[in-house]
Structures are given as structure tokens and as C-alpha cells.
Amino acid sequence: MAEERSYFGTDGIRGRVGEAPITPDFVLRLGWAAGRVLAGEGQRKVVIGKDTRLSGYMFESALEAGFAAAGVHSLMLGPMPTPAIAYLTRTLHARAGVVISASHNPHHDNGIKFFGPDGYKLDDATEEAIERLLQDGPPQMVRCEELGRATRINDAVGRYIEFCKGSVQRQIDLRGLRVVVDCAHGATYQAAPAVLAELGADVVVIGNEPDGLNINVDHGSQHPERLCQRVVEASADVGVAFDGDGDRVIMVDRYGRVIDGDGLLYIIATARVARGQVRGAVVGTQMTNLGLEVALQELGLVLERTRVGDRYVLERLLQVGGTLGGESSGHIICLDRTTTGDGLISALQVLEAMVTTGRPLDELVAGMHYYPQRLVNVPVSRGPDVIRLPAVTEAVEEAEHQLGDHGRVLLRPSGTEPLLRVMVEGADEGQVNRLADWLAVTVETAARGAATDPI
């Protein structure tokens, strides 16, 4: 049974800068504790990378000091996409990779997460061992002659650029494609434009002027409005937007319309089927649009659903022996290319499909028809308990009956807020909206100890 954790969540340790545990003294202790655990495995080398947040420099120094005190050497990568750090952990033969990032969150948040030597998330047992050391007391420094050293890897970005270029077929040439890239003022600001330009694309770049405070501000995968506008203004063929740490991507067609992770997953899967390269099921989440499931069935593929979160997508892929999975938000995992969600590599797979078929993005995604989906957030204090209330379960059964085989109902407690998320999906938009509103009222009323009549 897994131990109760004080610090590590599903995606490392994250919070607001200056508030426990995201403080310099804690991060130093974290580096020391991680170093002690990792040094015990015989390899005394880790890589450290970060996104473009101003606080990342402070935490980079704290981690380096902690690892040095534990006798572990640090290879410093500087600002790098999260998936690049996973890749370099493997190729530099490090015992672990450490990422300083809060992904798509604002600059005032930050976090720390670890990759193991294979480029996958650090295993639970190692994280639990680190937590135990954190709770044992202040760091105990090794002897001076045993202190770890820090080395700057000056060609880290170049290594990752070559890796990304190698993820598509050697003959792929993007000449003739005009691509607008939005780097969210984040970690992809160097690598993404360079990769696309070196493959021959005519690249227009926005969101590539990080100042430490503007990461994810009005740019990136969560704010595609400027990208949509720029694609149309520049008469571009396609737009690409990453989030702050580069593990998410969404794309925009030539008409300025957003293609989310579900649509991109469909395009990549279609290309893989054409080349006979699909292995196992495709993995999505509870929130994956039903339209993707139907479209994949037409390709002869099965969609496996798991909990929301890229770590759960990865776990399920490994369980079913699959190579392709992702989330609507743009976390896409191509296990035949890399070990984690990589926005740039995912975008390259889509661009490769455009080049090999000679078809624009809007035509490639046309085979998938999105089902209308409505999400309502209902304020409740105990989401899991409310879901089990008789009035709620009966209402869900009634809604599912009305939707039949052409829709879904999902009630999911928020992991961070006192909310219950009510999602209804179906072929008829009017019916979807009616049922979503009715279920939301039912949940809210039941949570107060009452019930509503069925519609």
C-alpha cells in the first residue's frame, strides 16, 4: 500500500512561490533528500532544467546546493521544455531528471517534479523514500571533498532540436508551409522555432519573448485567440501553440479554427494506421470527446478511457501495450517516439501527416465529428459523497437512458476546488444542454438535502 504523502502529488510538488512548500529552503532540503536517495543507487548525477519563470533561477540554485550537499553532481540545462528534460535524462545517463515548472499555471506558481533514468516519471517508492528523508530533520552535508559539482550543458537545446527533427521521416520537408508558432513566452521559445525552420517551414513566431513574468499570459495553448488571429492575418497554413513547459499543444487550421488534443490524436492515429504503425489501443480520458471514440472505431481502433491526467494516460498505455494516447487539453503521448507528453513532437507528427497526404489540417480532421459537450461546475463541499446520493444516481440513470447509445454522463469531483463537474455529451446539442442544466440543479439541490423531479 502506498504511503500517505505530505508533498508529492500526481505531478510532483507544486504551489505558490513563497508559500510552503515552494520556498528556497524547502527546495534545498528536497534536493538534498533526493540526492541522498539517488546516491544510494550508485549513480551520482542528475540533470536540472526549468521553464522561463523568474523564480526558476532561485529554485535552480537551491536544488543545486541541495544535491551538492548530498554529494550528487548536477548537469544544468537552463530553460528547456519538460519533455526535453526527460529525453536528456536518458541520453546523458543521469540517475534522475528534475523539472522546475508549474506548466500552464501563472508565473507566481512553480513546482518540482522528477523523471527516472528511463525518462519516465520517478517511481512511487523513490518519491516516498525522498519524503521520509525530508521529515527526518535538517540536511547532513557530506565531507567537503565529496561535494557534488555543477556543470552547465551548453548544447542542451541543440541536442533536443536534433532529437525532435529525428522524430519524423528523414525525407519530410516542410518547405512551402507557413507555420505560426506561439511559445507562450515559455520553455519552447528556443527549440520550437528552430526545429520548424530547420525542417524548411516558413515560421512566424509569437509569444517568444519571455521576461520571467509573462509565461502563459494571453498566449499559449490555453489562450489561442492571438494565434488564431495571426494565422489568418499571415495567410498561414497552420498554427501551433504550446503551454509554458511544452508538454501540451493545440493547433489552428488555415481558417483560424482551434483543433484540440482529441482532433490531433485522431490525425496522428489516422496517419499511423495508413503506415501500419499502430500497436494496441489508443488511450484517452473520461473527458475525451465521444466523436473521437466513434472515429477511431471506423479506423478499426479501440479507445481506452482512464482518469483525467497525462500520468494516467501513460500508465494505461503501458498496461495495454499501446503507443498513442492523450487528453483533450493537448497532452499527447507518442510512446513510439518518446517517454512523455511532448508538444513539439506531437505537432511534428501532425505536420508530417499534412506533408505526406498533401492535405490541409482542416481536411485531415474532417473525418472526426465532435459531439456536443456541456460541462457545468456545481459548488459542493463533498463531491464524492454527493455523487452517491440516491437522487443524484437516479438522475444520472435517467439522463443516460434518454441519451441512449449516443451520449455519456460523467460526474467528477474537482481535485483542487470544492466543485463537482457535471459533463453531458450527446448527438443532440439541445438535449445535451437540457440534461446538463437539469443534472446540475439536481446535484445542487441534493447536496442541500433535497431533490428535484425528473424532467
Curated annotation (Swiss-Prot):
Record's GO cellular component terms: cytosol
SUPFAM superfamilies registered for this protein in UniProt: Phosphoglucomutase, C-terminal domain, Phosphoglucomutase, first 3 domains
UniProt cofactor(s): Mg(2+)
PROSITE patterns: PGM_PMM (PS00710)
GO molecular function: magnesium ion binding; phosphoglucosamine mutase activity; phosphomannomutase activity
Cofactor: how bound: Binds 1 Mg(2+) ion per subunit.
Any Pfam family hit: PGM_PMM_II
Any one Gene Ontology BP term: UDP-N-acetylglucosamine biosynthetic process
Keyword terms, alphabetized: Isomerase, Magnesium, Metal-binding, Phosphoprotein
Binding site for Mg(2+): S103, D243, D245, D247
Source organism, top-level taxon: Bacteria
Modification Phosphoserine occurs at: S103
Catalytic reaction list: alpha-D-glucosamine 1-phosphate = D-glucosamine 6-phosphate
PTM summary: Activated by phosphorylation.
E.C. code: 5.4.2.10
Active site: S103
InterPro entries: A-D-PHexomutase_a/b/a-I, A-D-PHexomutase_a/b/a-I/II/III, A-D-PHexomutase_a/b/a-II, A-D-PHexomutase_a/b/a-III, A-D-PHexomutase_C, A-D-PHexomutase_C_sf, A-D-PHexomutase_CS, Alpha-D-phosphohexomutase_SF
CDD domains reported in the protein's UniProt record: GlmM
NCBIfam families registered for this protein in UniProt: glmM (TIGR01455), PRK10887.1 (NF008139)
Family indicated by similarity: Belongs to the phosphohexose mutase family.
Protein role: Catalyzes the conversion of glucosamine-6-phosphate to glucosamine-1-phosphate.
HAMAP family, per database record: GlmM_B
Name the record gives this protein: Phosphoglucosamine mutase
Species of the source: Halorhodospira halophila (strain DSM 244 / SL1)
GN (gene name): glmM
